Amino acid sequence: MTKPSILVMAGGTGGHIFPGLAVAEYLRICGWNVSWLGNQKGMEYRLVQSCNFPFEAVEFGGLRGKGLKAKLMLPINLARACFQSWKIMRRLKPSVVLGMGGYITFPGGLITKLLKRPLVLHESNSVAGSANLALAKIAMRTLTGFPDTMEKAEWVGNPIRQEFDNMPAPSTRYEQRQGPLSILVVGGSLGAAALNENIPAALALIPKEVRPKVIHQAGDKHLAELQARYAECDVEADIRPFI
């Protein structure tokens, strides 16, 4: 008997990728063949590879923050991405295609409809992204992580990776804990400007002798800026681009 197969499309940020990985891991346990469509230059490539899912690369990205040249090249880049997606889907013949968000899902979603494959979307954010908003018009089914995110969508919540279910209770995890309090600052995989600006200043108000240890996810683009901000506030922190 042939196993059912799914092609997961997601990229750009952890908010799209991690819920997609949760679905992919669960379906793999259930016996599905799972493949992933994404951009080899995006963070999804590293994350998906680490989970041992076959990765199908398509070259396509967003226009946010790009100049006039990128906008003029959009039709050519979209046509190329659609052709790449078409070749992938003709080869894999997935039973269903799941779009989790990010610009990379747009060309794949168009080709899914063209090849008359079932297209299911999931929007994990409270504000829907451009790709999912556009593809919702042609999707067989649209799901959301939050209520009232998209019209005519079904609110189902966000997929959670299995390792969170397997974690011991906090009372068990921290039973033997010693030393100063530690805090983790996470503003999403791309960082968050408001947190990057205000957290160092807030921590500076706490006396050094009782100040907690800080691990702060800055986002790749804001790493140097955040390091300078902590130095300006005379606060020691473990600053990382992505955790």
Regions found by a protein language model. Name each.
Residues N33, M43, P54, K113-P170:
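Active-site-proximal region of nucleotide-activated glycan assembly enzymes
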Residues G42, L47, C51, A169, ...:
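Donor-nucleotide binding loops and adjacent catalytic segments primarily
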Residues G67-V96, L114:
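An amphipathic, basic-hydrophobic alpha-helix
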